[in-house]
Protein backbone atom coordinates (compact mmCIF):
# COMPACT_ATOMS: atom_id res chain seq x y z
CA UNK A 1 0.00 0.00 0.00
CA UNK A 2 1.22 3.43 -0.72
CA UNK A 3 0.62 6.80 -2.25
CA UNK A 4 0.50 5.49 -5.82
CA UNK A 5 -1.39 2.27 -5.07
CA UNK A 6 -4.77 2.58 -6.79
CA UNK A 7 -6.38 0.06 -4.43
CA UNK A 8 -5.24 2.12 -1.44
CA UNK A 9 -6.69 5.28 -3.03
CA UNK A 10 -9.99 3.49 -3.69
CA UNK A 11 -10.07 2.12 -0.13
CA UNK A 12 -9.49 5.62 1.28
CA UNK A 13 -12.44 6.83 -0.80
CA UNK A 14 -14.83 4.43 0.94
CA UNK A 15 -17.42 6.35 2.93
CA UNK A 16 -17.67 5.80 6.67
CA UNK A 17 -20.46 7.03 8.96
CA UNK A 18 -19.47 9.99 11.13
CA UNK A 19 -21.14 12.18 13.72
CA UNK A 20 -20.18 15.86 13.86
CA UNK A 21 -19.34 17.11 17.34
CA UNK A 22 -19.53 20.83 16.54
CA UNK A 23 -21.72 23.25 14.63
CA UNK A 24 -19.67 24.04 11.53
CA UNK A 25 -20.80 26.97 9.38
CA UNK A 26 -20.79 26.72 5.61
CA UNK A 27 -20.55 22.94 5.33
CA UNK A 28 -24.25 22.35 4.73
CA UNK A 29 -23.48 21.32 1.14
CA UNK A 30 -22.30 17.99 2.55
CA UNK A 31 -25.94 17.22 3.37
CA UNK A 32 -27.34 19.02 0.29
CA UNK A 33 -28.06 22.30 2.12
CA UNK A 34 -25.66 24.81 0.53
CA UNK A 35 -24.96 27.89 2.63
CA UNK A 36 -26.25 26.32 5.84
CA UNK A 37 -24.19 25.04 8.76
CA UNK A 38 -23.77 21.44 9.77
CA UNK A 39 -25.17 21.15 13.26
CA UNK A 40 -23.75 19.21 16.17
CA UNK A 41 -24.74 15.49 16.23
CA UNK A 42 -25.42 15.44 12.47
CA UNK A 43 -24.61 12.02 11.04
CA UNK A 44 -23.04 11.89 7.57
CA UNK A 45 -20.96 9.50 5.52
CA UNK A 46 -17.53 10.90 4.66
CA UNK A 47 -14.66 9.34 2.70
CA UNK A 48 -12.17 7.69 5.02
CA UNK A 49 -9.30 10.01 4.04
CA UNK A 50 -11.33 13.02 5.26
CA UNK A 51 -13.06 11.34 8.20
CA UNK A 52 -9.74 10.07 9.57
CA UNK A 53 -8.27 13.60 9.63
CA UNK A 54 -11.38 15.15 11.17
CA UNK A 55 -11.54 12.39 13.80
CA UNK A 56 -7.94 13.02 14.87
CA UNK A 57 -7.79 16.82 14.76
CA UNK A 58 -9.31 18.49 17.80
CA UNK A 59 -11.58 21.46 17.56
CA UNK A 60 -12.13 23.77 20.51
CA UNK A 61 -9.44 23.80 23.17
CA UNK A 62 -11.45 25.16 26.09
CA UNK A 63 -9.37 23.88 28.99
CA UNK A 64 -5.67 23.08 29.10
CA UNK A 65 -6.20 19.90 31.16
CA UNK A 66 -8.76 18.41 28.78
CA UNK A 67 -8.05 16.84 25.43
CA UNK A 68 -9.64 18.70 22.55
CA UNK A 69 -12.77 17.09 21.15
CA UNK A 70 -12.27 16.06 17.51
CA UNK A 71 -14.49 17.53 14.80
CA UNK A 72 -16.15 14.19 14.05
CA UNK A 73 -16.62 10.87 15.74
CA UNK A 74 -16.10 7.90 13.43
CA UNK A 75 -18.96 5.44 13.84
CA UNK A 76 -18.48 1.71 13.21
CA UNK A 77 -19.43 0.89 9.60
CA UNK A 78 -21.79 -1.93 8.64
CA UNK A 79 -18.88 -4.00 7.33
CA UNK A 80 -17.62 -4.41 10.92
CA UNK A 81 -21.05 -5.00 12.45
CA UNK A 82 -21.77 -7.89 14.79
CA UNK A 83 -23.74 -9.62 12.03
CA UNK A 84 -20.74 -9.58 9.66
CA UNK A 85 -18.29 -10.60 12.40
CA UNK A 86 -20.53 -13.57 13.28
CA UNK A 87 -20.69 -14.56 9.59
CA UNK A 88 -16.89 -14.40 9.42
CA UNK A 89 -16.53 -16.57 12.53
CA UNK A 90 -19.11 -19.07 11.23
CA UNK A 91 -17.63 -19.76 7.79
CA UNK A 92 -14.83 -17.46 6.66
CA UNK A 93 -14.16 -19.35 3.42
CA UNK A 94 -17.72 -19.28 2.06
CA UNK A 95 -18.24 -15.59 2.86
CA UNK A 96 -18.58 -13.26 -0.14
CA UNK A 97 -16.17 -10.52 0.97
CA UNK A 98 -16.46 -8.70 -2.35
CA UNK A 99 -20.16 -8.03 -1.71
CA UNK A 100 -19.37 -6.67 1.78
CA UNK A 101 -16.63 -4.38 0.48
CA UNK A 102 -14.16 -4.85 -2.36
CA UNK A 103 -11.34 -3.49 -0.15
CA UNK A 104 -12.34 -5.21 3.09
CA UNK A 105 -8.85 -6.12 4.33
CA UNK A 106 -7.35 -2.69 3.59
CA UNK A 107 -10.19 -0.98 5.42
CA UNK A 108 -10.01 -3.42 8.33
CA UNK A 109 -6.29 -2.72 8.72
CA UNK A 110 -6.89 1.04 8.64
CA UNK A 111 -9.72 0.73 11.21
CA UNK A 112 -7.61 -1.47 13.49
CA UNK A 113 -4.72 1.01 13.32
CA UNK A 114 -7.03 3.93 14.13
CA UNK A 115 -8.81 2.35 17.09
CA UNK A 116 -6.49 -0.47 18.23
CA UNK A 117 -9.36 -2.95 18.06
CA UNK A 118 -7.82 -6.23 19.22
CA UNK A 119 -10.98 -8.31 18.75
CA UNK A 120 -11.38 -7.12 15.16
CA UNK A 121 -7.67 -7.76 14.56
CA UNK A 122 -8.03 -11.35 15.79
CA UNK A 123 -11.13 -11.98 13.65
CA UNK A 124 -9.52 -10.48 10.53
CA UNK A 125 -6.28 -12.44 11.11
CA UNK A 126 -8.19 -15.70 11.35
CA UNK A 127 -10.26 -14.75 8.30
CA UNK A 128 -7.12 -14.07 6.26
CA UNK A 129 -5.50 -17.32 7.37
CA UNK A 130 -8.54 -19.44 6.48
CA UNK A 131 -9.10 -17.74 3.14
CA UNK A 132 -5.38 -17.83 2.25
CA UNK A 133 -5.41 -21.60 2.61
CA UNK A 134 -8.40 -21.82 0.27
CA UNK A 135 -6.72 -19.36 -2.14
CA UNK A 136 -3.64 -21.55 -2.20
CA UNK A 137 -5.77 -24.63 -2.87
CA UNK A 138 -7.49 -23.00 -5.86
CA UNK A 139 -4.28 -21.46 -7.21
CA UNK A 140 -2.45 -24.80 -7.08
CA UNK A 141 -5.29 -26.85 -8.58
CA UNK A 142 -5.01 -25.20 -12.00
CA UNK A 143 -2.52 -26.58 -14.45
CA UNK A 144 -0.69 -24.70 -17.21
CA UNK A 145 -3.55 -25.48 -19.59
CA UNK A 146 -6.61 -23.80 -18.13
CA UNK A 147 -8.87 -26.44 -19.73
CA UNK A 148 -7.21 -29.26 -17.80
CA UNK A 149 -7.22 -30.10 -14.13
CA UNK A 150 -4.12 -31.02 -12.12
CA UNK A 151 -4.17 -34.57 -13.53
CA UNK A 152 -4.04 -33.26 -17.08
CA UNK A 153 -7.64 -34.17 -17.89
CA UNK A 154 -10.27 -31.67 -18.93
CA UNK A 155 -12.40 -30.64 -16.00
CA UNK A 156 -15.09 -28.03 -16.37
CA UNK A 157 -16.08 -28.51 -12.71
CA UNK A 158 -12.66 -27.35 -11.48
CA UNK A 159 -12.85 -24.19 -13.57
CA UNK A 160 -16.45 -23.46 -12.52
CA UNK A 161 -15.64 -23.92 -8.83
CA UNK A 162 -12.60 -21.67 -9.14
CA UNK A 163 -14.56 -19.03 -11.08
CA UNK A 164 -17.28 -18.99 -8.43
CA UNK A 165 -14.65 -18.72 -5.71
CA UNK A 166 -12.86 -15.85 -7.49
CA UNK A 167 -16.06 -13.80 -7.61
CA UNK A 168 -16.17 -13.80 -3.79
CA UNK A 169 -12.64 -12.41 -3.35
CA UNK A 170 -11.85 -8.85 -2.43
CA UNK A 171 -9.05 -6.93 -4.18
CA UNK A 172 -6.12 -7.92 -1.94
CA UNK A 173 -7.12 -11.58 -2.18
CA UNK A 174 -7.34 -11.34 -5.97
CA UNK A 175 -3.78 -10.02 -6.05
CA UNK A 176 -2.58 -12.83 -3.77
CA UNK A 177 -4.39 -15.40 -5.93
CA UNK A 178 -2.88 -13.99 -9.11
CA UNK A 179 0.67 -14.10 -7.72
CA UNK A 180 0.19 -17.55 -6.23
CA UNK A 181 -1.30 -18.93 -9.45
CA UNK A 182 1.54 -17.47 -11.55
CA UNK A 183 4.06 -18.97 -9.14
CA UNK A 184 2.49 -22.43 -9.44
CA UNK A 185 2.39 -22.13 -13.24
CA UNK A 186 6.05 -21.11 -13.37
CA UNK A 187 7.00 -24.01 -11.10
CA UNK A 188 5.11 -26.52 -13.28
CA UNK A 189 6.72 -25.14 -16.44
CA UNK A 190 10.13 -25.44 -14.84
CA UNK A 191 9.43 -29.04 -13.75
CA UNK A 192 8.23 -30.03 -17.24
CA UNK A 193 11.40 -28.61 -18.82
CA UNK A 194 13.66 -30.81 -16.69
From Swiss-Prot:
GO terms for biological process: DNA-templated DNA replication; double-strand break repair via break-induced replication; mitotic DNA replication initiation. It is found in: Nucleus. Gene3D superfamilies: 1.20.58.2050. Pfam families: PSF3_N, Sld5. Present with 2205 molecules/cell in log phase SD medium. Belongs to the GINS3/PSF3 family. This is DNA replication complex GINS protein PSF3. The lineage of its organism: Eukaryota, Fungi, Dikarya, Ascomycota, Saccharomycotina.
Amino acid sequence: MGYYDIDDVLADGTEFPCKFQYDIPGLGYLENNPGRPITKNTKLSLPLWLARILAIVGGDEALVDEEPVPFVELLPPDMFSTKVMNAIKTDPVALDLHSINSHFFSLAIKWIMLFSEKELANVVSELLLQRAQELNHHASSLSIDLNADSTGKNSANTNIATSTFLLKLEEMEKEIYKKSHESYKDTKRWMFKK
